[in-house]
Design a protein with these regions (language model features):
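Iron-sulfur-associated redox domains of electron-transfer enzymes in respiratory
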Residues: 2-158
Length: 158
């Protein structure tokens, strides 16, 4: 990957000033590293408010219900928390009625398990209540595991 720098002269013409490769100083850098990456997402969309209430990807699914910001706070989020799960992202502080949407998803699909990832911040405190309420309404014995993330990106599992 190279960045090209162009400049416009007084007469309106342009000339290339040079190029710069911001990655050349990194050890073991290879453009192939980026080309070989593909998404492991089992579905799209991943935002809770956008997903349908009934879908084949929910059948016997291991759900990951995570706060929007959690993936950015934990460097190993994909490898340690979301791999092999159906991700549903939401923000308990700003999203619509999360509990109602989850109640419908849980009631209409056979959910195998739920992993909750939330930040240890005031804005995420209601997240567990929404999920437990939805699971209770669905009357299904869904195992729920909770992981709290701290801003320092240290994760602690309850």
């Amino acid at each position: 990957m190279q960045m090209l720098y162009w400049a416009q002269n007084d007469s309106g013409g342009t000339a290339m000033l040079g190029s710069f490769n911001p990655w050349k100083h990194y050890d073991n850098y290879s453009e192939q590293m980026f080309e070989d990456k593909t998404s492991d997402l089992p579905q799209w969309p991943i935002k809770l408010w956008q997903v349908p209430e009934v879908s084949p990807y929910f059948h016997h699914a291991h759900l990951l219900i995570a706060a929007d910001c959690s993936a950015f706070a934990c460097p190993s989020f994909h490898e340690k928390l979301s791999k092999g799960k159906v991700p549903l992202l939401c923000c308990p502080a700003t999203d619509f009625d999360i509990a109602t949407k989850l109640e419908k998803i849980f009631s209409h699909n056979e959910i195998a398990s739920i992993t909750v990832v939330k930040m240890e911040k005031a804005c995420c405190q209601d997240m567990l209540e929404f999920i437990f309420r939805a699971a209770k309404v669905s009357r299904l014995p869904i195992p729920i595991q909770v992981t709290n993330l701290f801003v320092e990106a240290e994760d602690v599992t309850e």
